[in-house]
């Protein structure tokens, strides 16, 4: 079956269409409802009773879908544009990736409000654990057979499920907040760790285990992040990562902001990524709108995104080396970051959170003298990377602390949804800029740095290589910056080019409406993933033909990377955990959203 197939034919790749044929052959075409979208992948609805069977087939098919990339839900109750889709009060989607096919597929399940139950997928993909917990936390959907279905982002005492459409979206819709001494005691008691709840023993045959809170304010936790460690001496027997302390409800806020006014919020997801955060969002909105941006816009966006990749990696490098005991390098990396920020501020007007990309372009054109600033940075940075590699990364103490530590292979990385440098350090050559070029990356020459041991040291070396390749990309942007407009000539470009508003009354009216109310995007779904600073980051947007998003799903790499911690570090020492945390490259805003 096909929903609204006459309205839009999705641009599937051959491998995407192949899996639809394979599914129809195995289960029968009547099993599926094919949903036309602008996601660029097959989207198929399946009956709940066939879900696990279909997911297992996709996990085991030749060239299998080895990665559960994302899993989340949608409250469908207020959605008006649903013609041809299965009746649903809520839905859950499973976004699966096959690296061998370089192909994705999305499986959806419709649920009635009276029966919000699904079988768990944790027996197929271990990383379904945290995603299912978050879906229960946000929507109240139960996953039967889940090993520990508890709150993920919200406090244990929280009432309600925030991403439901009938849940308040603004603080003014709640009673004024107060925290009495009794309530504070209640909240603290709720956070007390009980080993028995997690199947942990307090005693072994000949020893008593110690339970230690690492965080939520430990400097090596890199943010408000708590890991409960079960210890035998200094050996980690087991551990439980606990997140949510930095949760700000970013996906809920997207439902109350216009498509345009949500751009600054994207900056605050990975707050070290700057405009890199804007890119998947605006690309996804542009798919909804049918906007094709000028080539100059593509090149400007790539250049600024690579600047922020370098800024992120310099901070990572300095703090990583500091975590294992060397204090000096972090001061040098911050000095070099200042040089990069000088360029960023001159071009965008801001440093950490420029919010500079726009729907259909960028905020303004490159200023006079931008090329001189970029050239100065390109002349400075390569020799600094040489110094870091010689003085710090070849240091015998650092190598001793990190080589062979927190090691995992490609198979394990994919099972846990690991992407970015953490995946490429295992020898897996998968970088979206090469495998699935976006925003014009196919026009640039660069290499994908790889390592093969998958340990804490290799992850750092991959990041070093990425900085060199980012410099190479920026050099090409500098030498080959095309002429042309910095915004697309399209009715949904927001805001429209300023020059046009001064000449044409219709453009001025459009500007007024789009900035005050927001542009109206066609009803559909769109998706865009990018190779961000910490791994693959994506925005999956659902438009119901309004000025605001009906549903915004933000998939971040750090969420998946922290879930992997127990499988990697159990059996190691506390000192190895510190080196491992430093090698991951995460910020809690990226985890908690």
Curated annotation (Swiss-Prot):
InterPro entries: NADH_DH_suC, NADH_DH_suCD, NADH_Q_OxRdtase_suD, NADH_quin_OxRdtase_su_C/D-like, NADH_UbQ_OxRdtase_30kDa_su, NADH_UbQ_OxRdtase_49kDa_CS, NDH1_su_D/H, NiFe-Hase_large. GO terms for molecular function: NAD binding; NADH dehydrogenase (ubiquinone) activity; NADH:ubiquinone reductase (non-electrogenic) activity; quinone binding. HAMAP family: NDH1_NuoC (MF_01357), NDH1_NuoCD_1 (MF_01359), NDH1_NuoD (MF_01358). It catalyses: a quinone + NADH + 5 H(+)(in) = a quinol + NAD(+) + 4 H(+)(out). It is a peripheral membrane protein. In the N-terminal section; belongs to the complex I 30 kDa subunit family. In the C-terminal section; belongs to the complex I 49 kDa subunit family. Residues 208-593 are annotated as: NADH dehydrogenase I subunit D. It comes from the Bacteria. NDH-1 shuttles electrons from NADH, via FMN and iron-sulfur (Fe-S) centers, to quinones in the respiratory chain. The immediate electron acceptor for the enzyme in this species is believed to be ubiquinone. Couples the redox reaction to proton translocation (for every two electrons transferred, four hydrogen ions are translocated across the cytoplasmic membrane), and thus conserves the redox energy in a proton gradient. NDH-1 is composed of 13 different subunits. Subunits NuoB, CD, E, F, and G constitute the peripheral sector of the complex. This is NADH-quinone oxidoreductase subunit C/D. GO terms for cellular component: NADH dehydrogenase complex; plasma membrane. It is found in: Cell inner membrane. Keywords: Cell inner membrane, Cell membrane, Membrane, Multifunctional enzyme, NAD, Quinone, Translocase, Transport, Ubiquinone. Its EC number is 7.1.1.-. NCBIfam families: NuoC_fam, NuoD, PRK06075.1, PRK11742.1. Residues 1-184 are annotated as: NADH dehydrogenase I subunit C.
């Amino acid at each position: 079956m096909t929903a609204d197939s006459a309205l839009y034919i999705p641009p599937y790749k051959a491998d995407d269409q192949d899996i639809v044929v394979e599914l129809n052959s195995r289960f029968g075409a009547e099993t599926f409802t094919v949903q036309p979208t602008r996601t660029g992948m097959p989207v198929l609805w399946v009956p709940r009773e066939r879900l696990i069977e279909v997911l297992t087939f996709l996990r085991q098919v030749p060239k299998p879908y080895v990665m559960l990339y994302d899993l989340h839900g949608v409250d469908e109750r207020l959605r008006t544009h649903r013609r041809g889709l299965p009746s649903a009060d809520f839905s859950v989607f499973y976004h699966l990736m096959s690296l061998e096919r370089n192909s994705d597929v999305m499986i959806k399940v419709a649920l009635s409000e009276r029966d919000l139950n699904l079988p768990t997928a944790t027996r197929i993909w271990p990383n379904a654990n945290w995603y299912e917990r978050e879906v229960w936390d946000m929507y109240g959907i139960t996953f039967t057979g889940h090993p520990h279905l508890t709150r993920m982002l919200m406090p244990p005492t929280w009432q309600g499920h925030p991403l439901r459409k009938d849940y308040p979206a603004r603080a003014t819709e709640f009673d004024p907040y107060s925290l009495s001494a009794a309530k504070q005691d209640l909240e603290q008691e709720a956070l007390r760790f009980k080993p028995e709840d997690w199947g942990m023993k307090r005693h072994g045959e000949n020893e008593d285990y110690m339970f230690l809170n690492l965080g939520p304010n430990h400097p090596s936790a890199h943010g408000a992040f708590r890991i409960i460690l079960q210890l035998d001496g200094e050996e980690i027997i087991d551990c439980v990562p606990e997140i949510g302390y930095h949760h700000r409800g970013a996906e809920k806020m997207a439902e109350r902001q216009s498509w345009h006014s949500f751009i600054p919020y994207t900056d605050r997801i990975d707050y070290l990524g700057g405009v890199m955060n804007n890119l998947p969002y605006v690309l996804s909105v542009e798919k909804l709108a049918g906007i094709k941006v000028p080539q100059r816009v593509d090149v400007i966006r790539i250049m600024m995104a690579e600047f922020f990749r370098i800024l992120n990696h310099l901070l990572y490098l300095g703090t990583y080396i500091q975590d294992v005991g060397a204090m000096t390098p972090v001061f040098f990396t911050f000095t070099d970051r200042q040089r990069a920020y000088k360029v960023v501020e001159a071009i965008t007007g801001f440093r950490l959170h420029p919010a500079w990309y726009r729907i259909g372009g960028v905020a303004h054109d490159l200023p006079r003298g931008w090329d001189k600033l970029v050239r100065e940075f390109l002349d400075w940075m390569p020799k600094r990377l040489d110094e870091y590699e010689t003085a710090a990364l070849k240091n015998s103490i650092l190598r001793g602390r990190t080589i062979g530590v927190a090691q995992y292979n490609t198979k394990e990385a994919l099972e846990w949804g690991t992407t970015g440098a953490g995946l490429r350090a295992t020898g897996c050559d998968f970088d979206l800029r090469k495998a699935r070029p976006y925003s014009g990356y196919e026009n640039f020459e660069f290499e994908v740095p790889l390592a093969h041991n998958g340990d804490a040291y290799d992850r750092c070396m991959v990041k070093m290589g990425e900085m060199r390749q980012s410099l190479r990309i920026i050099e090409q942007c500098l030498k080959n910056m095309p002429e042309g407009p910095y915004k697309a000539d399209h009715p949904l470009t927001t805001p429209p080019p300023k020059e046009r508003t001064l000449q044409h009354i219709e453009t001025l009216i459009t500007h007024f409406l789009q900035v005050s109310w927001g542009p109206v995007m066609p009803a559909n779904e769109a998706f865009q993933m990018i190779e961000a600073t910490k791994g693959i980051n994506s925005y999956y947007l659902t438009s119901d033909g309004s000025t605001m998003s009906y549903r915004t799903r933000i998939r971040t790499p750090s969420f998946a990377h922290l879930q992997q911690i127990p499988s990697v570090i159990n059996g190691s020492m506390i000192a190895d955990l510190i080196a491992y945390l430093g090698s991951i490259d995460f910020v809690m805003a990226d985890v908690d959203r």
